[in-house]
Swiss-Prot record:
Name recorded for this polypeptide: Trans-2-enoyl-CoA reductase [NADH]
Enzyme class (EC, first level): oxidoreductase
Lineage: Bacteria, Bacillati, Bacillota, Clostridia, Eubacteriales
Catalytic activity entry: a 2,3-saturated acyl-CoA + NAD(+) = a (2E)-enoyl-CoA + NADH + H(+)
Pathway(s) of this molecule: Lipid metabolism; fatty acid biosynthesis
Catalytic site positions: Y234
Record Gene3D superfamilies: NAD(P)-binding Rossmann-like Domain
Gene from which the chain derives: fabV
Residues that hold NAD(+) according to the record: 47-52, 73-74, 110-111, 138-139, 243, 272-274
Record-annotated site: Plays an important role in discriminating NADH against NADPH: E74
Assembly information from the UniProt record: Monomer.
GO biological process, one term: fatty acid biosynthetic process
Domain of life: Bacteria
Length: 389
């Protein structure tokens, strides 16, 4: 069938298999051009199908020549409904890696569940022995507590007081004022349960108990801080509370891994167009301005550039750590001259000048690319088989 983008709000409900494959190939190409990294050899990536998790799986496999086990929860094609972009991404990467004669194991299931943890541990024992790097990059709207069975939901709200600011509807290019209401205590706790560090710790404890962690193992979870303009909705909101919990967990994990000389790290990454960030009010406008400023300065990076740099710093022993022991690969975003330029543009921006003062057009293009649309070298008028890549 011929696949075209279809939308429900900020969610694209279709994905293009050949476009997703091309997107993965472009990232692989970047890594190959930049050379090998002497690093991890057996890697578990939790949340391996999109964004930073996908980039981590690609860098591990292609730069480090590591065996990779990737866990994701994606939708296969059914009837006339395409698979999710993540499903095509993982299939594309798996085919490519196996074509090179390397190992890539994928598990499609709920990483929050005990069943998937057990399945992954068995697969590590059978195929890899032990892993020396665990990447934690899960993003989900809900999580079922594996002990109590209670289902928790995450939400995107402020804490304490409502907050009004500008946001961008990137479909229309309109700048609108938006008010975000404060969360209840229940919503704050729900977001922490889904997006905090609890499940990361459960994974590390289960892997350690099963004796599938290598001596000197490292584990990294991804976070974001950003500038003050986004604080009320992000860092000081429900998501920020969850990220604080995630960051606190890194130190606790280092204690758990002490007997293995292991370490838990948080990597604070750059703001990028992802399925998650495009739905966050205010952040979409901030990213559009950020992209324009960083491109003009020649410092712009996407997921793959960020993660390649992080792996290189991690394994070459020159990590950029802050006072709280967090890896800072958001350093180019948070550079004083970049943030000063954004602060100057922010109050001036309107629906009339948004395409001139920001990179709103590119935000839209990048968003479409997440689902395999708008990539060079893909004929979108062709009939495609939506069940495979």
């Amino acid at each position: 069938m011929i696949v075209e983008p279809k939308f429900r709000g900020f969610i694209c409900t279709t994905s293009h298999p050949i476009g997703c494959k091309k997107n993965v190939e472009n990232q692989i190409e970047y890594v190959k051009e930049n050379g090998k990294i002497e690093g991890a050899k057996r890697v578990l990536v939790l949340g391996a199908s999109t964004g930073y998790g996908l980039a981590s799986a690609i860098v591990a496999s292609e730069a480090c020549d590591a065996e990779v086990l990737g866990v994701s929860f994606e939708r296969e094609a059914k009837g006339k409904r395409t698979a999710s972009a993540g499903w095509y991404n993982i299939e594309s990467l798996k085919k490519f890696v196996e074509g090179e004669g390397k190992k890539f194991i994928s598990v499609n299931g709920d990483a929050f569940s005990n069943e998937v943890k057990s399945e992954v541990i068995d697969l590590i024992k059978e195929n890899m022995g032990k892993v020396d790097l665990v990447i934690y990059s899960l993003a989900a709207p809900k999580r079922k507590d594996p002990v109590s069975g209670e289902v928790y939901s995450s939400c995107l709200k402020t804490v304490g007081a409502p907050f009004t600011s500008k946001t961008l509807d990137f479909h229309t290019g309109e700048i609108q004022d938006i008010t975000i209401n404060p969360a209840t205590e229940e919503e704050i706790e729900g977001t922490r349960k889904v997006m905090g560090g609890e499940d990361w710790m459960l994974w590390i404890e289960a892997l350690k108990e099963a004796n599938v962690l290598e001596n000197g193992v490292k584990t990294i979870a991804y976070s974001y801080i950003g500038p003050e303009v986004t604080y009320p909705i992000y860092r000081e909101g429900t998501i920020g509370r969850a990220k604080n919990d995630l960051e606190k967990t890194a130190g606790e994990i280092t204690k758990v891994l002490k007997s293995l000389n292991g370490e838990g790290y948080i990597s604070v990454n750059k703001a990028l167009v992802t399925q998650a960030s495009s739905a966050i009010p205010i952040v979409s406008l901030y990213i559009s301005i950020l992209y324009k400023v960083m491109k003009e300065k020649g410092t712009h990076e996407g997921c793959i550039e960020q993660i390649y740099r992080m792996f290189k710093e991690l394994y070459e022993g020159n990590l950029n750590l802050d006072s709280e022991n967090r890896i800072r690969i958001d350093d180019l975003e948070m550079a004083e001259d970049v943030q000063k330029a954004i602060e100057e543009i922010w109050p001036q921006i309107t629906s009339e000048n948004v395409f001139e003062l920001s990179d709103a057009e590119d935000f839209k293009k990048e968003f479409f690319k997440l689902f395999g649309f708008g990539l060079e070298g893909v004929d979108y008028s062709e009939d495609v088989d939506i069940t495979t890549v």
